[in-house]
UniProtKB/Swiss-Prot annotation:
Organism: Magnetococcus marinus (strain ATCC BAA-1437 / JCM 17883 / MC-1)
NCBIfam families to which the protein is assigned, alphabetical: dnlj (TIGR00575), PRK07956.1 (NF005932)
PROSITE patterns, sorted: BRCT (PS50172), DNA_LIGASE_N1 (PS01055), DNA_LIGASE_N2 (PS01056)
Protein name: DNA ligase
Gene giving rise to this polypeptide: ligA
Binding annotation for Zn(2+): 485, 488, 503, 509
């Protein structure tokens, strides 16, 4: 009974996991999955003989290893030749065409030799050059060629050998024929992930081994670690797979996971990873698989290696479809394209999309689609002739640190910034790079004059990765942490346990005021269109803005504004209109705009929903605030401290007197002031947490749409949470939701919520 139940649980759990992680479809609630998982764990603990290689309980990580065993690849994991320009791709396509046309000629001649015993004819073939055309169906064309050639041979075959002219004529006609074939080659194009290549071996559908690429001939056994990666099926789905199947793929770390991992390391004062590739490699090669399990690695499959006891399709695109059907994750960006122009168009599209992807890529891989044509093209040295890696501009480059400047942020954080000798990184000229904080600067020991590696990826601010070792480094001056604010001269301070160094000047510091005004006017706050960085700086230089409330006095200075550089009458009119309109913004936007430390968009909404007015919030105690969902004691103390400061009280009174609605009027219940009664909205009473990276829109955009439908978007998961919307690279919130029995929705279900399609299990949790 236990054995059959364990087998049933394994089958169901693996099916649910495949549906969730590969197909992005949740078939059961996370609470139900968790219950079945615990049941299987209990059965296996009671009877270890029930544990099988495909048990999902293996994903949590096993015992710590003493080292990695070497593994010999049965089929070498070769590298690819690189292309760096459009011309390189055109040349690659031309070489493919020539190679295929040549293979037709050589095979035709070889067949002719074998048929008639002409052992010396091959010497006349040599290696035909510059043949244009391609053999789309080699066998059919060979037959066509032979039917064309055979009438040319004389009755006495030996006389052909004595006639170089006749043999040369045959070869000429063969080459002409090959050149006249349709010029059509299909490729499959895929993103080139910047991760770690490895292989998975399945015996009768069960994962039996995983190995890193290593040197291509020999890698390391990482089977225990691969089992912890959710994208790696422990047992293949469906049927039709070979008895022994080796799958090739790339392990990578999503960008959001990488940033989170490094942020946590910085907080602990530990060494950070230079890039997601290093993070993925370091995570996979941990001796303790439990560490690997905690790192959130993902995988895409891109082909097969050794196959036994079965056959695969001729077309690579069909092989990818088969792999997906067997439960393996393949890139949704893969496309079948035709010819050089198809390859070029794909790389352009992928390049435009590169910075929106949730993982890092460094190019595209282009492979001839037909396996038969691949065999005819063969290999050269270490790489196949039928594939090419097109490389995007590098995201890391070396340059020189010319200076280290200090920036003071809205909350007083002082950030060291390296001023660099201009360098092109990823197609963008970089002149500045963050050093994050002074503890990180000291750990990397960056000095003015150093040669450094600078990294830029996606929307991430360029950063100094490391110093390039040189003898001159020791002679350079060590950069010392400042004891006073570089702008206002106030003493610097560091709160207990924090890595950030702060200016203690508060609103007496012009740098903090400038950043505070920019934040107040930003899109997610009061949304004052046209009031950006340069204009705020201009207004402060002119003495027109010294604090936030001065924005609402600018209408008194219209003539002065018109006279400012880069401002005309129309621009001033538009600016003043935008400022006037901002007076009606919602309480949530107003609170976020105040810049209270640790009060983001979501928490500002929670405070606005809980209190009836600004006066009520200002009178709240720490105990009052801690009772609100998403508010912890640290944040509560910061909110109370903010409103207790006299200069903040004076500023809020000024905003009230100047007509800013949220500063003086009772707060409305409906989200973001849309003017619709909450009870009439389809998602009224539903609290939603967003986590991970969404493919179709940002989390902020999703939050706005949900709030517009009456939902309350909160920051953390609790037993009262209505649902968790989970994108790619979800973190600890997913595990917490599963533990609390909170329904988990994918992006497709989120779109359903936007349409008012509410699943029954979520309707039951709505408190409207």
């Amino acid at each position: 009974m236990s054995a059959s139940r364990a087998a049933e649980l394994r089958k169901r759990l693996n099916h649910y996991a495949h549906s969730y992680h590969t197909l992005d479809t949740s078939l059961v609630s996370d609470a139900e999955y968790d219950r079945l998982f615990r049941e299987l764990q209990s059965l296996e603990a009671a009877d270890p003989t029930l544990i099988s290689a495909d048990s999902p309980t293996h994903r949590v990580g096993g015992a710590i290893l003493e080292g990695f065993e070497k593994v010999r690849h049965r089929v070498a994991m070769l590298s690819l030749d690189n292309a760096f320009s459009a011309q390189d791709l055109v040349e690659f396509h031309r070489r493919v065409q020539e190679g295929l046309a040549e293979s037709v000629v050589v095979e035709a001649v070889q067949h002719y030799q074998d048929e008639y015993g002409l052992s010396d004819l091959g010497a006349l073939v040599g290696r035909p050059g510059a043949l244009e055309g391609v053999a789309r169906d080699v066998t059919q064309r060979l037959n066509q060629t032979l039917s064309f050639v055979e009438p040319l041979q004389p009755p006495d075959t030996k006389s052909l050998l004595s006639s170089g002219r006749k043999a040369a004529d045959i070869l000429r006609r063969l080459r002409l024929w090959a050149a006249e074939q349709p010029q059509r080659v299909e490729y499959v194009a895929e993103p080139k992930l910047d991760g770690l290549a490895f292989s998975l071996t399945y015996a009768e559908g069960v994962l039996v081994r995983a190995a890193t690429r290593g040197d291509g001939q020999e890698g390391e056994d990482v089977t225990a670690h691969a089992r912890t990666i959710q994208d790696v099926p422990l047992r293949l789905q469906g049927a039709g797979y070979p008895a022994l199947l080796e799958v090739r793929g790339e392990v990578y770390m999503p960008l959001a996971t990488f940033e989170k991992l490094n942020a946590e390391a910085r907080e602990r004062g530990e060494k950070t990873f230079a890039n997601p590739r290093n993070a993925a490699a370091g995570s996979l090669r941990q001796l303790d698989p439990k560490i690997t399990a905690s790192r959130g690695l993902r995988m895409f499959c891109y082909g097969t290696g050794y196959v036994e006891g079965g056959t695969l399709a001729d077309r690579y695109a069909e092989i990818l479809a088969a792999l997906k059907g067997w439960g393996l994750r393949v890139s949704p960006e893969a496309e079948r394209v035709e010819g050089a122009q198809g390859c070029l168009a794909y790389t352009e599209r992928l390049g435009e999309k590169r910075e929106t992807l949730p993982y890092e890529i460094d190019g595209a891989v282009l492979k001839v689609d037909s396996q038969r044509l691949r065999e005819r093209l063969g290999f050269v040295a270490r790489a196949p002739r039928w594939a090419m890696a097109f490389k995007f501009p590098a995201t890391e480059e070396s340059t020189t640190v010319q200076a280290i400047d200090l920036q003071v942020g809205r909350t007083g954080v002082i950030t060291p910034v390296a001023r660099l000798e201009p360098v092109a990184v990823g197609g963008v000229t970089v002149t500045n790079a963050t050093l994050h904080n002074f503890l990180e600067l000291a750990r990397k020991d960056v000095r003015v004059g150093d040669r450094v590696i600078v990294r830029r990826a996606g929307d991430v601010i360029p950063e100094v990765v490391r110093v390039i070792p040189r003898e001159s480094h020791g002679a350079l001056a060590v950069y010392k942490e400042p004891v006073a604010c570089p702008v206002c001269g106030a003493p610097t301070e560091r709160e207990g346990g924090e890595t950030a160094l702060r200016c203690s000047g508060g609103l007496t510091c012009r740098a903090q005021v400038k950043e505070g005004v920019k934040h107040f006017a930003s899109r997610k706050a009061m949304n004052i269109e046209g009031l950006g960085d340069k204009l705020v700086a201009l207004l402060m230089q002119a003495g027109l803005v010294e604090r936030i409330s001065d924005l609402y006095r600018l209408h008194e200075q219209r003539q002065v504004l018109v006279g400012l550089e880069r401002l005309g009458g129309k621009s001033v009119a538009n600016l003043l209109e935008a400022i006037e309109q901002s007076k009606a913004q919602s309480a949530a936007r107003f609170l976020f705009g105040l810049g209270i430390r640790d009060v983001g968009v979501t928490l500002a909404g929670s405070l606005a929903a809980h209190f009836t007015s600004l006066d009520a919030l200002m009178a709240a105690t720490v105990e009052d605030l801690v009772g609100i969902e998403d508010v912890g004691e640290v944040v509560a103390r910061r909110v109370v401290h903010f409103f207790a400061q006299a200069h903040h009280g004076a500023e809020l009174a000024a905003l009230r007197a100047l007509g800013v609605a949220a500063a003086g009027e009772p707060w409305r219940v409906e989200p973001d002031g849309h003017g619709v009664a909450a009870a009439e909205q389809p998602l009224s009473g539903l609290s939603v947490v967003l986590t991970g990276t969404l493919a179709g829109l940002t989390r902020e955009a999703a939050a706005v749409r949900l709030e517009g439908l009456g939902a309350k978007v909160v920051a953390s998961v609790s037993g009262k949470t209505g649902c968790l919307v989970c994108g790619e690279s979800a973190g600890s919130k997913l595990a917490k939701a599963q533990k609390a029995g909170v329904p988990v929705l994918d992006e497709a279900a989120l779109e359903g919520l936007f349409r008012g399609e509410i699943p029954p299990e979520i309707q039951a949790r709505m408190q409207g």
